[in-house]
A protein has these predicted regions:
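SDR active-site lid
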Residues: 174-256
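Substrate-binding pocket helix/loop in short-chain dehydrogenase/reductase
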Residues: 96-100, 104-109
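The beta1-alpha1 cofactor-binding region of Rossmann-like NAD(H)/NADP(H)-dependent oxidoreductases
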Residues: 40-41, 59-70, 105
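Conserved glycine-rich cofactor-binding loop
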Residues: 8, 15-16
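Active-site helix of classical SDR
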Residues: 123, 160
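Residue(s) in the substrate-gating loop at a strand-loop-helix junction
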Residues: 144
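Conserved glycine-rich Rossmann-like NAD(P)H-binding loop of the short-chain dehydrogenase/reductase
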Residues: 29-45
Length: 302
């Protein structure tokens, strides 16, 4: 996809972070922009800055199928077509670093609801309409480096992102099989300066783990700040995504720091070997240009 001027982008999670940066980049390319976010006020502020005639803010809970269907209806009613779909919304359940068996069911339901079903609902609501329009277009699904590496940490987040990777590969293959003029890019951010770790403020009451209150140590907060100082900016991530869209390239990574782990995982699978993996926090530190040994409680890549 090369011609953006006058066309329409729909971006979920557009109220902050990578989503907001994608919205601004789309607007700078001359696109109409539909900004979807559960935090409607933030989305409206960005839409106002872009310009009322070219931007529409919609409150949307991507974990809810009806909410995403309403988003699609609003986008088509306002602009008549959707040419670029960015299924970008994502969250990381907060609290202490847990092993896979320590996450509550609410953590799993919330993570899968936003990180996986948000993408599924977006594809179901928009892709058939984009195909029917017969216009060149593009779909960007935001996965994560956590979706292509192994490890014990951030299990309910990583599991959802692994599923997004597989779903996005299937989307790419399916569109190629029917000859649709729609490209697909899978964005896999490493450590990016966003508010993804602050998503607890938006956790639905139904998914709150009342028997396991969220708490994070001062050490963890300090470590996160250290990592973020040299992390990729949301604007840089958005530029990487748009470069891939323009080049019609499937994979878009914000860093090469995780390449050894990706290669090792593939080698282990082909060798039928037991998994061997580098700690994702250590890889995040390399991504941020830090070299001291990480503690066991450090945050994981977004």
């Amino acid at each position: 996809m090369h011609d953006f001027d006058g066309r329409t982008a729909v971006i979920t999670g557009a109220g902050s972070g990578i989503g907001a940066a994608l919205a601004r980049r789309a607007a700078n390319e001359g696109m109409n922009v539909v900004l979807a976010d559960i935090q409607e006020t933030q989305a409206r502020e960005i839409a106002t800055a872009i310009g009322g005639d070219r931007a529409l803010a919609v409150r949307c809970d991507v974990s809810d199928e009806a909410s995403v269907a309403a988003l699609a209806d609003a986008a088509y009613a306002r602009f008549g077509t959707v040419d670029l779909l960015c299924n970008n919304a994502g969250i990381v359940p907060g609290g202490r670093h847990r092993k896979v068996w320590e996450y509550g069911l609410g953590d799993w339901q919330w993570s899968l609801g936003v990180n996986l079903y948000g993408v599924v609902h977006g594809m179901r609501a928009f892709v058939p309409r984009m195909i029917a329009a017969g216009r060149p277009g593009h779909i960007l699904n935001t996965a994560s480096v956590a979706g292509v590496v192994s490890g014990s940490g951030s299990a309910c987040y990583g599991a959802a992102k692994h599923a997004v990777v597989r779903a996005t590969e299937a989307l790419y293959a399916g569109l190629k099989e029917i000859g649709a003029p729609i490209g697909v890019t899978m964005l896999c951010p490493g450590l990016v300066k966003t508010g993804i770790y602050d998503a607890e403020r938006n956790r639905p009451a139904a998914f709150v783990e009342s028997d396991d209150p969220i708490s994070e140590s001062a050490e963890l907060e300090a470590m996160r700040e250290e990592l973020y100082r040299n992390a990729t900016t949301a604007e840089e991530a958005a530029d990487i995504a748009f470069d891939a869209i323009i080049a019609d390239r499937f994979y878009a990574f914000t860093t090469t720091a995780f390449d050894p782990a990706i290669r090792q995982r593939a080698d282990d699978i082909l060798a039928r070997a037991n998994p061997s993996f580098d700690d994702i926090v250590a890889m995040s530190r390399r991504d941020a240009g830090l070299d001291r040994e990480p503690s066991a409680s450090e945050p994981h890549a977004a």
